[in-house]
UniProtKB/Swiss-Prot annotation:
Gene3D superfamilies: Histone, subunit A (1.10.20.10). One of its GO terms (biological process) is heterochromatin formation. CDD domains: HFD_H2A. The keyword DNA-binding applies. It is found in: Nucleus; Chromosome. Pfam families: Histone, Histone_H2A_C. Residues 1-22 are annotated as: Disordered. Residues 7-19 have a biased composition (Basic residues). This is Histone H2A.J. It comes from the Eukaryota. The lineage of its organism: Eukaryota, Metazoa, Chordata, Craniata, Vertebrata.
Length: 129
């Protein structure tokens, strides 16, 4: 009867992170903590860190996809800063967003001014016809 331990107690559900509830890989809890500690506002709503984590995850996925394509175009299996640079600078919107950002070891986009290219002479034009 009594004294046999807790028999009718509530079973606590397994803890589920806010990231998994939102279906995200980025840490919602960490983003929330950083928003609170960063003195951006006196109070931080419950939806703000979820939204911010989702935006950060989307931007990261977008950049990594383009950088992966750049790595594959260069016949490489590892993404290096050069691939990130090529991905960002060749995408119009990402270039506008990250226009003032310098990527270490990124290099520059290959570009030769049209004026500097050798002109086709008359003899080359007649040979090609």
């Amino acid at each position: 009867m009594s004294g046999r331990g807790k028999q009718g107690g509530k079973v606590r559900a397994k803890a589920k992170s806010r990231s998994s509830r939102a279906g995200l890989q980025f840490p919602v809890g960490r983003v929330h903590r950083l928003l609170r500690k960063g003195n951006y506002a006196e109070r931080v709503g419950a939806g703000a860190p979820v939204y911010l984590a989702a935006v950060l995850e989307y931007l990261t996925a977008e950049i990594l996809e383009l950088a992966g394509n750049a790595a594959r175009d260069n016949k490489k299996t590892r993404i290096i800063p050069r691939h990130l640079q090529l991905a960002i600078r060749n995408d119009e919107e990402l270039n506008k967003l990250l226009g003032k950002v310098t990527i270490a070891q990124g290099g520059v986009l290959p570009n030769i001014q049209a004026v500097l290219l050798p002109k086709k002479t008359e003899s080359q034009k007649t040979k090609s016809k």
